[in-house]
Regions:
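Core RecA-like ATPase module of SF1/SF2 helicases and allied nucleic-acid translocases
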Residues: 1-4, 16-122, 127-135, 157
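Short, conserved active-site loop motifs that form the nucleotide-linked donor/cofactor pocket
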Residues: 9-12, 85
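Short beta-alpha junction loops
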Residues: 138-142
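Long, charged, helix-prone linker segments
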Residues: 143-154
Length: 157
């Protein structure tokens, strides 16, 4: 179901590890930037801190301007005119929207010892931050990743 959004069919792709997932997202973001989408219109939304650290390290090494919004206050008070990719948790992303959103590590969901229904709602929050393009990646197999692959294949057909 579309959740009332319009835009490109979401992308979901399997990669061998989290680092390669982030590298794929960087490739996608560079392509969107080359097509005229500003860095400030892109966000990477993650579930747990180690993912955010991997994202930040790789974006910095790639020379992409980036701002890590590590808390709820920061996610509400950032400079939206600063031309940088915004990186934040799924929780912090609530209420925000970006033309381009990437979510790495979908295969980690549902996160250990957390209610799968709550994790599904949290993933939904992250996914619906995307107004035009949604890129998701996974390397670990999970019920969430498989359901997303199936749903996107159905929509794209």
């Amino acid at each position: 179901e579309s959740a009332g959004r319009h835009g490109a069919v979401p992308l979901i792709t399997h990669r061998p590890n989290l680092g390669v997932e982030v590298d794929y997202i960087i490739e996608c973001f560079r392509q969107y930037h080359d097509e005229g989408i500003a860095w400030r219109e892109m966000a990477i939304i993650y579930r747990v801190k180690f993912m955010g650290e991997e994202v930040m390290n790789r974006l910095r090494r790639a020379g992409i301007p980036v701002e890590w919004l590590q808390g709820s206050w920061e996610s509400r008070h950032f400079d939206s005119s600063a031309d940088s990719v915004k990186v934040m948790t799924m929780h912090s992303s609530k209420g925000l929207e970006f033309p381009v959103v990437a979510i790495p590590g979908v295969g980690y969901l549902p996160w250990k010892d957390f209610d799968p229904a709550e994790e599904a709602r949290l993933l939904y929050v992250g996914m619906t931050r995307a107004m035009e393009h949604l890129v998701m990646t996974y390397h670990a197999e999970s019920s969430f990743a498989q359901k997303l692959v199936t749903a996107i294949e159905r929509v794209a057909a």
